[in-house]
């Protein structure tokens, strides 16, 4: 959802519910029955350099779907090719993956659009339960993820990146205390996730709902379905279109979350 800015279900949803590595020949397009655009395809078609650094093998789905074989021909201006993700890099240890990323970030203009996936909290929650007591395996994993984010932010303070880089931090789900699964989509411990945005011109400590009183509504402890005439909550699926908006690019074709690119962050 984050990369397509679509919800899962419904005629406009991306439809992918398989939570394992893709099988031979699997793509988001084949599963949906039609081509699905993404933030990677829009950015790449406009000549932007894209990357995906991940710590789970299942993210190969994105590289397959928008790679040189299944990516759609570039319809915008100069032909930038069918491979919409210039660099796909996967290491199962987040620490090793971020180490590799840090080496790349030392190069000016390494990427225009980059997605980084850190697996530690999710792996600990599923393996040992969501436990916010200290000490716990889960909180140790959260601490490690925080340290890895700090490493990335340190590099973004370098002159090549400072003052012209935006960062969005979010998650795909939460987790109920004392459990290892998150299947109940009406439990706020499952659907409440962080959505932080940093970058030039973004006011420190501002609340995104306060910045968007006419277009977004805090759902509190409810998980509302999309409904005409009702303001939606801020959804993590809006991240893809927000990234493109911050880059000065149009929304993802066929997207339904933040499709108007009206989520204000500054």
Show which residues each predicted segment covers:
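Metal-dependent active-site segment of extracytoplasmic phospho-/sulfohydrolases and closely related
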Residues: 144-185
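Active-site nucleophile/metal-coordination loop of metallo-enzymes that catalyze phosphate/sulfate
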Residues: 1-45
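Substrate-binding rim/cap in mid-to-C-terminal beta-strand-loop elements of soluble/periplasmic
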Residues: 3, 185-247
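Structural recognition of the beta-strand scaffold that forms the well-ordered cores
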Residues: 1-4, 40-42, 49-54, 61-63, ...
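Polar, surface-exposed loop/tail segments
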Residues: 249-266
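Active-site His/acidic residue clusters
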Residues: 63-82, 102-151
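Solvent-exposed loop/turn segments at secondary-structure junctions
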Residues: 8-9, 50, 56-61, 119-124, ...
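A substrate-binding/cap region within the structured catalytic cores of diverse enzymes
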Residues: 26-109
């Amino acid at each position: 959802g984050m990369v397509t800015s679509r919800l899962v279900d419904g005629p406009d949803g991306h439809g992918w519910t398989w939570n394992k590595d893709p099988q031979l020949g699997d793509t988001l397009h084949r599963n949906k029955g039609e081509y699905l655009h993404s933030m990677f395809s829009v950015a790449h078609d406009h000549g932007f350099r894209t990357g995906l650094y991940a710590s789970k093998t299942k993210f190969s789905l994105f590289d397959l779907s928008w790679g040189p074989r299944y990516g759609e021909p570039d319809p915008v201006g100069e032909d930038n090719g069918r491979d919409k993700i210039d660099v796909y890099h996967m290491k199962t240890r987040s620490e090793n993956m971020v180490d590799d990323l840090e080496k790349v970030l030392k190069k000016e203009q390494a990427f225009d659009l980059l997605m980084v996936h850190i697996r530690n909290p999710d792996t600990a929650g599923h393996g040992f339960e969501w436990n916010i007591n200290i000490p716990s395996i889960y909180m140790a994993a959260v601490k490690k993820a925080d340290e890895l984010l700090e490493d990335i932010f340190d590099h973004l303070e370098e002159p090549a990146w400072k003052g012209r880089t935006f960062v969005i931090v979010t998650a795909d789900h939460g987790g109920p205390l004392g459990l290892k699964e998150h299947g109940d989509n009406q439990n706020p411990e499952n659907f409440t996730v962080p959505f932080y945005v940093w970058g030039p011109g973004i006011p420190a400590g501002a609340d995104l709902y306060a910045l968007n009183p006419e277009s977004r509504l805090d759902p509190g402890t409810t998980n509302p379905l999309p409904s005409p005439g009702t303001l939606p909550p801020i959804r993590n699926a809006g991240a893809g279109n927000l990234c493109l908006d911050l880059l000065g690019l149009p929304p993802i074709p066929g997207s339904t979350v933040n499709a108007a690119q009206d989520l204000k962050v500054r």
